[in-house]
Structures are given as structure tokens and as C-alpha cells.
Curated annotation (Swiss-Prot):
Found on the solvent side of the large subunit. PANTHER family: 50S RIBOSOMAL PROTEIN L33, CHLOROPLASTIC, LARGE RIBOSOMAL SUBUNIT PROTEIN BL33C. This is Large ribosomal subunit protein bL33. The gene is rpmG. Part of the 50S ribosomal subunit.
Length: 54
């Protein structure tokens, strides 16, 4: 059976290390680690969130 193209992942805040968001990505289109600037409710500001596997 073929491997799935879309993988599920968590986005972790780079400042407080809390995992705030769950999302998925297409690993063919974005092979590198995903980095998004999202709001962290624990830090109460927008911070960079990096991809972490579930």
C-alpha cells in the first residue's frame, strides 16, 4: 500500500515549548520543517511555531 502524502503534525511555540496547534501538511510540497508565525495563548503574543511530529 502506498504511503500517505499528507501527514499530521503539531506546531510548538519556540519560546514556551507548548504545543498549541494541530495541523497537517503535504510532505511532497513542503519537505522541510514547517515554521509559522501564530498566536500563543500562553505567551500572549505572536511567536514562531515549528513543526513537531505527533
Amino acid at each position: 500500500m502506498a504511503s500517505e502524502v499528507r501527514i499530521k503534525l503539531l506546531l510548538e511555540c519556540t519560546e514556551c515549548k507548548r504545543r498549541n496547534y494541530a495541523t497537517e501538511k503535504n510532505k511532497r510540497n513542503t519537505p522541510n520543517k514547517l515554521e509559522l508565525r501564530k498566536y500563543c495563548p500562553w505567551c500572549r503574543k505572536h511567536t514562531v511555531h515549528r513543526e513537531v511530529k505527533i
